[in-house]
């Protein structure tokens, strides 16, 4: 017996593997710029015969240029972030959102829930001779509205209850 020799190729047509498609072909990277449609092929002679039998040139096809975005154009937008202001029973220094000036707020006192609860409590305790209306004279029991001294806009309210 003879020793087995080197491997030999199988008989028949040899198949050479082809390379896979490129990334651009697979994903379509250039999909941002659509390719114009291919022109329709004309007759092989290059001349088209008209209704009167005379030869005419084939129509020419024009493609529109693809717009290229300007890489140098940068839009700059300034954003101002204003911190939320906490309103209490004292004036607040702030920038007015209406007139855009730096101001110290003016205060206005109004009867709120704490004022009415105090009045009702005093009435139940027996202060019916007008003493139950004392909370309407005490600023510490009323709600506080903050106004801009320039444009008189209401900026915020401090509610005690």
UniProtKB/Swiss-Prot annotation:
Residues 76-160 form the LITAF domain. Zn(2+) binds at residues 96, 99, 148, 151. The keyword Ligase does not apply. It is found in: Cytoplasm; Nucleus; Lysosome membrane; Early endosome membrane. A motif (PPxY motif) lies at residues 20-23. One of its GO terms (molecular function) is zinc ion binding. Transmembrane segments: none annotated. Detected in brain, heart, lung, liver, spleen and bone marrow. Detected in myelinating Schwann cells in sciatic nerve and in bone marrow-derived macrophages (at protein level). Widely expressed. Highly expressed in liver. Residues 111-134 are annotated as: Membrane-binding amphipathic helix. Induction: Up-regulated in macrophages exposed to lipopolysaccharide (LPS) (at protein level). By estrogen and lipopolysaccharides (LPS). It is a peripheral membrane protein. One of its GO terms (biological process) is negative regulation of non-canonical NF-kappaB signal transduction. GO terms for cellular component: cytoplasmic side of early endosome membrane; cytoplasmic side of late endosome membrane; cytoplasmic side of lysosomal membrane; cytoplasmic side of plasma membrane; Golgi apparatus; Golgi membrane; lysosomal membrane; nucleoplasm. The keyword Glycosyltransferase does not apply. Keywords: Cell membrane, Cytoplasm, DNA-binding, Endosome, Golgi apparatus, Lysosome, Membrane, Metal-binding, Nucleus, Transcription, Transcription regulation, Zinc. Its main location: cytoplasm. The PPxY motif mediates interaction with WWOX and NEDD4. Monomer. Interacts with NEDD4. Interacts (via PSAP motif) with TSG101, a component of the ESCRT-I complex (endosomal sorting complex required for transport I). Interacts with WWOX. Interacts with STAM, a component of the ESCRT-0 complex; the interaction is direct. Identified in a complex with STAM and HGS; within this complex, interacts directly with STAM, but not with HGS. Interacts with STAT6. Plays a role in endosomal protein trafficking and in targeting proteins for lysosomal degradation. Plays a role in targeting endocytosed EGFR and ERGG3 for lysosomal degradation, and thereby helps down-regulate downstream signaling cascades. Helps recruit the ESCRT complex components TSG101, HGS and STAM to cytoplasmic membranes. Probably plays a role in regulating protein degradation via its interaction with NEDD4. May also contribute to the regulation of gene expression in the nucleus. Belongs to the CDIP1/LITAF family. This is Lipopolysaccharide-induced tumor necrosis factor-alpha factor homolog. It comes from Mus musculus. The gene is Litaf.
């Amino acid at each position: 017996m003879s020793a087995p020799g080197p491997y030999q190729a199988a008989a028949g047509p040899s198949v050479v593997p082809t390379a896979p498609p490129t990334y651009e072909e697979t994903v379509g990277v250039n999909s941002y710029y659509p390719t114009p449609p291919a022109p329709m092929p004309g007759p092989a002679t290059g001349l088209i015969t008209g209704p009167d039998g005379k030869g005419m040139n084939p129509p020419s096809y024009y493609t529109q240029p693809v717009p290229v975005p300007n890489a140098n154009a940068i839009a700059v937008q300034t954003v101002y972030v204003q911190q939320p202001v906490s309103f209490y029973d004292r004036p607040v220094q702030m920038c007015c959102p209406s007139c855009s000036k730096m101001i110290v707020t003016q205060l206005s006192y109004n009867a709120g829930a704490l004022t009415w609860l105090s009045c009702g409590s005093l009435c139940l305790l027996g202060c019916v001779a007008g003493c139950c209306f004392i909370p309407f004279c005490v600023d510490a029991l009323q709600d506080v509205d903050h106004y801009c001294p320039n444009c008189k806009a209401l900026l915020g309210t401090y509610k005690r209850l």
